[in-house]
């Protein structure tokens, strides 16, 4: 079959490449700025077996916890959300006994905390609860331990859901029960105090002002965020340049300077910044 001309061909590859490059937009090295950061501080009040009274030896822990509460309460950039009291009894001893025990530990801990907060004139909501048998805590501690027959104990927990049967099956593993009684179970007899609070960051106005007047007062996330508060490329460039000086080991400011240069049509300058970003990433 003889060749038949259909149409004149064109070489469009170079044109397509140029169009693609012309429309390309390098990725921004984004900040991780959070105005409100949630934090917490924990402390454990420990109890003796089958006891719910708070011993004098535990008052030091309570005092240190209250000191942290006071520090957060007094800080201008922090706000207390609440204080949690989570009281527990270890799984040995039976459900009925441990229910009463855990409830009494919760009540005694909450009373102590309320008294301390009132004395310090701190108004903070308290959320209290108790867990009669802390099987979750037991499983976690056993999992992290190196005790004999660990896998057998964990298998018992997965096989039986009834607490009385669990306890009996574990007691039947006589070779390890004394170790559990000495090393694991005492850690579960506790009231956990949890101070939940927020760290409140600078406002947009504060960040924008500091970025131009005193950028050294800003951390890297705040400084990178400051550049997003303006649409002026010149101001963005100034902020990113300052960020490279304060935080030379963070690639994002170099990357973002490269992005600005590329968008301005300065490919050589953009390439230089991108190479620098790659070298510190």
Protein language model features and the residues they cover:
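N-terminal targeting segments with Sec-dependent signals, encompassing both cleavable signal peptides
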Residues: 1-281
């Amino acid at each position: 079959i003889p060749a038949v001309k259909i149409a004149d061909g064109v070489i469009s590859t170079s044109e397509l490449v140029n169009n693609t490059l012309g429309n390309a937009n390098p990725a921004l090295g984004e900040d991780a700025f959070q105005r409100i950061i949630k934090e917490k501080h924990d402390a454990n009040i420990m109890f003796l077996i089958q006891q719910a009274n708070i011993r004098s030896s535990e008052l030091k822990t309570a005092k240190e916890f209250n000191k942290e509460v006071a520090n957060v309460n007094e800080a201008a950039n922090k706000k207390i959300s609440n204080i949690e009291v989570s009281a527990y009894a270890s799984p040995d001893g039976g459900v009925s006994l441990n229910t009463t025990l855990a409830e009494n530990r919760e009540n005694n801990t909450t009373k102590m905390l309320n008294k301390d907060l009132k004395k310090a004139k701190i108004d903070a909501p308290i959320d209290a609860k108790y867990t009669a048998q802390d099987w979750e805590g037991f499983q976690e501690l056993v999992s992290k331990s190196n005790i004999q027959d660990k896998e057998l104990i964990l298998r018992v927990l997965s096989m039986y859901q009834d607490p009385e049967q669990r306890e009996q099956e574990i007691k039947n593993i006589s070779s390890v029960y004394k170790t559990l009684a000495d090393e694991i179970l005492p850690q579960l007899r506790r009231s956990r105090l949890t101070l939940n609070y927020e760290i409140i960051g600078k406002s947009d106005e504060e960040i924008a002002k500091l970025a131009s007047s005193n950028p050294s007062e800003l951390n890297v996330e705040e400084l990178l965020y400051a550049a997003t508060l303006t649409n002026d490329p010149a101001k963005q460039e100034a902020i990113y340049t300052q960020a490279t000086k304060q935080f030379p080991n963070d690639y994002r400011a170099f990357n973002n300077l490269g992005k600005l240069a590329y968008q301005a049509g300065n490919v050589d300058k953009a390439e230089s910044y991108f190479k620098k970003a790659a070298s510190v990433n």
